[in-house]
From Swiss-Prot:
Presence of keyword Lipid metabolism: no
Organism taxonomic ancestry: Bacteria, Pseudomonadati, Pseudomonadota, Gammaproteobacteria, Enterobacterales
Sample GO molecular function, one term: ATP binding
Recorded name of the encoding gene: anmK
Name of protein: Anhydro-N-acetylmuramic acid kinase
Protein's UniProt keywords contain Ribosomal protein: no
Record HAMAP family: AnhMurNAc_kinase
Top-rank lineage group of the source organism: Bacteria
CDD domains hit by this protein: ASKHA_NBD_ANMK
Family: Belongs to the anhydro-N-acetylmuramic acid kinase family.
Alphabetized InterPro entries for the sequence: Anhydro_N_Ac-Mur_kinase, ATPase_NBD
Keywords: ATP-binding, Carbohydrate metabolism, Kinase, Nucleotide-binding, Transferase
Length: 370
């Protein structure tokens, strides 16, 4: 593997910021050295949300958003370099996931689209950039997601302990790590996505800090049962999903015809949906000794409490307790995937995505030679 300093850039479905992380990576270790979260301007955030929820968009608007996101990602990297007093020459490459605006891995013409022009990232930072990680897996019949389980396996596999790494971002996904067995992983369903969208609509807050609003409400069993009957939860793996499926339009369909309820009760019920849909999948794959949680949902005390209650006998903790920052996990993963791409090594796991073979992921955007 090509060792060096790498920067990972991740803008996830939760849209809570652009996560940028600096790590020293070699064949055996991934050592995080610095991190930074760059704000996403509100107009860009709203444009992304509109596209993800199927609003009509012109090619001009899509192209301009692609450019603006590329510039934004470059600004995030340059800010991290300034904070760490490093130069572009000190960095081997950037692994830039991009912003998913559509993910449709099934049907006659499976597709996934991450925007944020990597040409701009490379040009503005002066650093070789690796991006467009998902579509090669799709080309081999895979879901294109999740890709992070290969990183979980490299970093958090235990010699004897059966573990599940659970990432709760906008969407929740799990990685089953069993010594001596192939990795399994998939998207379980909504993580923070519906929670954030609902509190933004009713309270104009980007997220429910410490789950205070949800804890002021009561779970509505009728709504919960209706949501849990959604066909996605019964699908067999490999499977993946996103904001184009689980969004406020989906929630409004679930609420249709039910007696009126307080918005905080809906919020409480959405927390229970996230916790129950995760817990059911944890049990479906045979459980584990330790559930390691990362992503923004790891900071939601109500989700963590409910997971512990729904999974008795399983130790529920965070990846931070294993020395890996839960907030930076995905950005770290794409820094690591960039190192594998530059080394000509595969980055996907067919046992997770359903692809017909392992493959090198992504496209490389080199900088001009001096």
């Amino acid at each position: 593997m090509r060792s060096g300093r790498y920067i990972g850039v991740m803008s996830g479905t939760s849209l809570d910021g652009v996560d940028v992380v600096l790590a020293a990576i070699d064949e055996h270790t991934v050592a995080q050295q610095a991190s930074y979260c760059h704000p996403i301007p509100q107009d860009i955030k709203m444009a992304i949300l509109g596209m993800c929820q199927g609003q009509a968009v012109t090619l001009s608007a899509l192209g301009q958003l692609d450019t603006r996101l590329g510039i934004l990602f470059a600004e995030a990297v340059l800010t991290l370099l300034k904070e760490t007093e490093l130069r572009a020459q000190d960095i081997t490459a950037i692994g830039c996931h991009g912003q998913t605006v559509w993910h449709e891995p099934t049907g006659d013409a499976p597709c996934t689209l991450q925007i944020g022009d990597n040409n701009r990232v490379a040009a503005l930072t002066g650093i070789t950039t690796v991006g467009d990680f998902r579509r090669r897996d799709l080309a081999y019949g895979g879901q294109g997601a999740p890709l992070v389980p290969s990183f979980h396996h490299a970093l958090l596999l235990h010699p004897v302990e059966r573990r599940i790494v659970l990432n709760i971002g906008g969407i929740a996904n799990l990685s089953l790590l069993v010594p001596g067995a192939p990795v399994r992983g998939y998207d379980t369903g909504p993580g923070n996505m519906l929670l954030d969208a609902w509190i933004w609509r009713h309270c104009a807050q980007p997220y429910d800090k410490d789950a205070m609003w949800a804890m002021s409400g009561q779970v509505n069993p009728l709504l919960l049962r209706r949501m849990l009957t959604d066909p996605y939860f019964a699908l067999r793996a490999p499977k993946s999903t996103g904001r184009e499926y689980f969004n406020l339009s989906w929630l409004e369909r679930m609420l249709a015809g039910l007696p009126p309820m307080a918005p905080q009760d809906v919020q409480a019920t959405l927390v229970e949906l996230t916790a129950m849909s995760i817990a059911e999948q944890v049990l479906l794959v045979g459980g584990c000794e330790r559930l390691l949680v990362c992503g923004g949902g790891a900071r939601n005390p109500l989700i963590m409490t409910r997971l512990s209650a729904l999974l008795p006998g399983i130790e529920v903790s965070t990846t931070d307790e294993c020395g890996v920052s839960g907030d930076d996990m995905e950005a770290l993963a794409f820094a690591w995937l960039a190192s594998r791409t530059l080394s000509g090594l595969s980055g996907n796991l067919p046992s997770v995505t359903g692809a017909s073979q392992e493959t090198v992921l992504g496209a490389i955007y080199p900088v001009n030679a001096d």
